[in-house]
Every structure is written in structure tokens, then in C-alpha cells.
């Protein structure tokens, strides 16, 4: 008597595709629309900050702390303007070290990058965008993630935060 063998399942020859993250939530417009970041107005920055070019501000001998005149280590908001009076960047300092948001702008006024510092070290999330608004670099130090993309939104690097 002949016994018919049971059919076997085909062996999959394709590997499962790795799911790539959706970069849309990292676009500048999406981040700003959903108020993920707080960006200060130029008026606020100028009213409450010090223009880097107008003050005698410099580094200490070890180039580690930021100082202001003979008053010692600087605490406050420093900003830079371009030749046309447009805001180029601003950053908060505490006791001579970056402490708080640092934001840099393109000449068009669009945000180039955003990062947060604590005691001179980048903490949390770092965003860098192309001028077209797509994410260039995203580093999440809390969840140890890093994504880099080209100007068309294609991921070029993905892995752990440095």
C-alpha cells in the first residue's frame, strides 16, 4: 500500500523587510505644528538676551566656560544677528556653560537646528533640518536613537545615538 506524503510548507526564500520609521513626524513643520519644541520669538530674544557681538564676551583660559567681562561666568541668553539684523541663533548659558535651548536659523529665518543642553552637554533630542524642512539629523539620547536622511527624505544612517 502506497502512503501519500503530507504536503510540506514552502521554505520562505524572501527575508522579512525591515520597517523603516516614518520621517514625517520629524519634519520641521510637523514638529512646530504639534508644539514639540518651544521656539522664542526674535522680539523676546532681543528684549531678554545679550547680543554676542555687542558685549565683551569670551572663553576662559581652558576654552570651557563662557565668561562676560570681569563679572565671572555668564548666566543668561546670548544671541547673534546677521548683517541685516535677522536672528541667526540663540543659546542659554548658566554659570558659563550651555544650559537650555540652542537654536540656529537659516538666513531665510527657518530653523536649521535645535538642541537642549544641561551643564554644557547635549541632553534629550537634537533636531537638524534641511532648509526645505525635511529632517537631516535626529538624535534622541533618552531612547538611544539616531536617524540621518538626505534632502529627499531617504534614510542614510540609522542606529544608536553617539
Which stretches of residues belong to each language-model region?
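Glycine/tyrosine- and acidic-biased, solvent-exposed loop/turn segments at the edges of beta-strands
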Residues: 1-162
Amino acid at each position: 500500500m502506497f502512503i501519500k506524503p503530507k504536503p510540506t510548507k514552502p521554505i520562505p526564500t524572501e527575508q522579512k523587510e525591515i520597517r523603516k520609521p516614518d520621517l514625517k513626524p520629524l519634519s520641521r513643520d510637523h514638529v512646530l505644528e504639534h508644539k514639540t519644541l518651544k521656539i522664542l520669538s526674535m522680539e523676546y530674544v532681543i528684549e531678554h538676551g545679550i547680543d554676542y557681538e555687542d558685549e565683551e564676551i569670551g572663553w576662559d583660559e581652558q576654552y570651557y566656560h563662557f565668561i562676560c567681562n570681569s563679572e565671572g561666568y555668564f548666566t543668561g541668553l546670548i544671541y547673534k544677528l546677521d548683517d541685516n539684523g535677522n536672528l541667526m541663533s540663540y543659546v542659554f548659558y548658566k554659570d558659563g556653560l550651555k544650559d537650555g535651548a540652542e537654536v540656529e536659523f537659516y538666513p531665510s529665518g527657518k530653523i536649521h537646528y535645535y538642541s537642549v543642553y544641561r551643564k554644557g552637554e547635549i541632553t534629550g533630542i537634537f533636531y537638524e533640518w534641511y532648509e526645505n524642512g525635511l529632517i537631516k539629523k535626529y538624535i534622541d539620547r533618552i531612547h538611544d536613537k539616531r536617524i540621518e536622511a538626505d534632502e529627499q527624505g531617504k534614510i542614510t544612517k540609522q542606529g544608536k545615538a553617539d
